[in-house]
Regions:
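Short, surface-exposed glycine/acidic/tryptophan-bearing loops
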Residues: 81, 125-143
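Structured segments of extracytoplasmic/periplasmic soluble domains
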Residues: 60-62, 90, 109-120, 149, ...
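N-terminal secretory targeting signals
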Residues: 1-53, 198-224
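Surface-exposed patches in mature extracellular/periplasmic domains of secreted proteins
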Residues: 98-102, 119-128, 167-173
Length: 224
């Protein structure tokens, strides 16, 4: 057999084996986890009381394409129920239209975001969700997914962390481009996480049940 013939056979064998080797190397690579989270260290939580915000909130619900600009406080410093009711309406479930009274602490945090980022409009990605899965803070009207145009979500995430004196959850969603902020049940530790999954990634449809357990309190009705 000539040297040229041998060289051609060797080259052919290398070309055939190359794709197989590449496929094996790809299989060996570990898949990157979409989610990572941990309890927040107590040493990282806020130790000083939060100053009272201005009360101003400019909020737009992305799915509903509605927005409001209100002050959650009356001139005497008490809560303005009519303003809270307008925000409750904006926080309503986009799928069912159900409305619940959202935790006022969440609205105070919204006002702090408004104050910190120079009065920019806050976009609400998700508020109250009328779902059967009652482990979600959205179900209990104590969570929100937000973003602000022109502000990086990392900056929003860091600011949200600075507001946590205990009992808050703060999540970063780089793929979807928003942060999650919630208030936890009494005694629950603060939690931090990053979720790289995109919209509707891995979500399963939940069957609706005819019987439902206790839910969050009814929505507030405007008083003025």
């Amino acid at each position: 057999m000539s040297m040229r013939r041998i060289a051609l056979l060797v080259l052919t064998a290398l070309l055939v084996s190359a794709p197989a080797s590449a496929a094996k190397s790809k299989k060996k690579k570990k898949r990157h986890s979409d989610f990572s989270g941990h309890n927040a260290l107590k040493s990282t939580l806020r130790s000083e009381p939060l100053p009272k915000p201005s009360g101003e909130v400019w909020l737009r619900a992305e799915n509903l394409k509605e927005e409001v600009k209100v002050n959650i406080y009356k001139p005497d410093g008490s809560y303005d129920d009519a303003a809270l009711a307008k925000l409750d309406e904006l926080f309503r479930c986009s799928r069912t239209g159900a409305v619940r009274a959202v935790r006022t602490e969440l609205y105070e945090q919204l006002s702090r975001f408004y104050d910190r980022f120079e009065g920019k409009r806050i976009d609400l990605v998700s508020g109250f969700r009328f779902q059967e899965r009652n482990s979600s803070r959205h179900f209990h009207a104590s969570a929100m997914d937000i973003r602000i145009s022109g502000v990086s979500i990392k900056e929003l995430y860091k600011f949200a962390e600075s507001l946590d004196a205990g009992g808050m959850g703060v999540g970063l969603y780089p793929t979807s481009g928003f942060i999650h902020v919630d208030f936890r049940a009494p005694g629950e530790p603060s939690y931090r996480w990053t979720d790289w999954s995109g919209p509707n990634s891995g979500k399963k449809k939940h069957k609706k049940s005819k019987k439902t357990g206790p839910r969050t309190q009814p929505a507030r009705k405007p008083t003025s």
